[in-house]
Regions:
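Glycine-rich, aromatic-flanked loop segments that form ligand/cofactor-binding clefts
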Residues: 128-168
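Metal-dependent enolase-superfamily TIM-barrel catalytic cores that perform enediolate-based chemistry
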Residues: 154-274
Length: 416
């Protein structure tokens, strides 16, 4: 069925493709229940030098939705193939892409029949993001409107800094002061970095001496000496430490008024986090490594942390991210979004961040949104004076650069 006929039959013809008025509930309900929109093609898109991949869902009405996940893209692609070729509940071909909750539940339950998490959850996250992209295009509304509207007119970001994602070639060891001063000049209010990771790797996370501790704290002092409290500081630990070392580090950081401590321990023992949380005056962030609201439930119930952080391409997608934030809000816990993947994760995170009521920060990485994402899109969300906004276009608002999918380093694989 042609797109024009579909729009007319689904009661959206009167709105027109350029219309942005909010359609009534009956119109949306009629479209979602319509047998006329179906997934007719599933394909993956990989880039030879990228650690992330895309999933594209094509429909019989000419609308294509695009999702994303990362890393381990061979495993992610294999899961999508298995869902499509061998599964008893996960097939996408021929289904209605607007049945977002139904799709999530049947794939999640099939995956949980074997094991929950890993590549299966990453694949489900990509599927969910692609479906929401389709929903927005069908309704001719930006995604944040479908998620409840833009309660956050400006979305506050912090900047994660590593030497592999450097600004102007500056390294943390040599140029900490320049980095801090640059971020402040850009209006960015907080930095996150990993001053303790080198010691954790050397000692396997089992011990940190006072001398080693002082060496790590020097990085913090250099920021304070350069810009004072114009730049908040968050510390990332990559779950490398044991409990006694984490307590020692947390106590040592307290005089420096640190914004948060992220993933000090592995996420598989919330009672250990409860012990750490009782010892630390600094808010604990847990954890983009958790998948689905079921993974976060124990954190909330145990009182293990102060801030919930998730990654939309890992936790189950946009649907699940919204549920995690809403669940956190019942405990008066704010949420943050991890965005260390590809450009579509960045797009999706800005949309959800605009709509949730308990947003703390969204992670940003200056070289990715400022430079990398422009290699793929005409309109990647840009940080302005420390804040970002989602595109005001239907769905995710993706505007691919011309000829992107024909480039030599792009691998497009048709799954079904």
């Amino acid at each position: 069925m042609k797109r024009r006929i579909f729009l007319r039959n689904s009661a959206f013809g009167a709105l027109g493709l350029a219309g942005f008025g909010l359609p009534g509930f009956r119109q949306i309900q009629a479209t979602a229940a319509s047998p006329d929109i179906r997934i007719t093609g599933v394909e993956t898109v990989r880039f030879r030098n990228a650690h992330w991949m895309w999933l594209r869902l094509h429909t019989n009405v000419g609308i294509t939705g695009t999702g994303e996940t990362y890393p381990f893209n061979e495993a992610n692609t294999s899961v999508i193939k298995d869902l499509e070729w061998h599964s008893w509940a996960g097939k996408l071909l021929g289904t209605n892409p607007l049945e977002i909750e139904q799709t999530w539940e049947r794939i999640f339950r099939q995956n949980a029949f074997h094991v929950t998490g890993g590549a299966e959850m990453r694949a489900l996250s990509a599927i969910n993001i692609a479906q929401w992209d389709i929903m927005g295009q069908v309704c001719q509304l930006p995604l944040y409107q479908l998620l409840g509207g833009s309660i956050n007119k400006k979305i506050r970001v912090y900047n994660t800094y590593t030497n592999s994602r450097a600004i102007n070639g500056w390294t943390l060891e040599e140029d900490m002061e320049k980095i801090a001063e640059f971020l402040v000049s850009e209006g960015i209010q907080a930095i996150k970095f990993c001053p303790f990771d080198r010691v954790a790797r050397r000692n396997n996370g089992e011990y940190i001496s006072w001398k080693e501790l002082e060496g790590c704290l020097d990085w913090i002092r250099r920021i304070r000496d350069a810009v004072g409290y114009d730049l908040d500081i968050g510390c990332e630990f990559h779950s490398m430490w044991n409990l006694p070392s984490a307590i020692r580090i947390a106590h040592a950081l307290e005089p420096y008024h640190i914004l948060f401590l992220e993933d000090m321990l592995l996420q598989d023992n919330m009672q250990a986090y409860v012990s750490l949380n009782q010892e630390s005056d600094i808010p604990l962030v847990i954890s983009e490594r958790l998948a689905s609201r079921f993974g976060f439930r124990e954190m909330f119930e145990a009182g293990a942390g102060s801030i919930a952080m998730y990654d939309l391409t890992w936790c189950g997608g946009i649907s699940e991210g919204k549920k995690i934030s809403d669940m956190a809000n019942t405990y008066y816990i704010p949420t943050m979004m991890h965005t260390a993947g590809g450009p579509i994760l960045w797009y999706a995170s800005t949309h959800l961040a605009a709509a949730i009521t308990n947003l703390f920060y969204v992670e940003s990485v200056y070289p990715t949104w400022h430079d990398r994402d422009k290699l793929y899109f005409k309109n990647p969300p840009q940080v302005n004076n420390g804040h970002v906004l989602p595109p005001d276009l239907p769905g995710l608002g993706l505007q691919f650069i011309d000829g992107l999918f024909e480039q030599e380093d792009v691998i497009v694989e048709k799954i079904s």
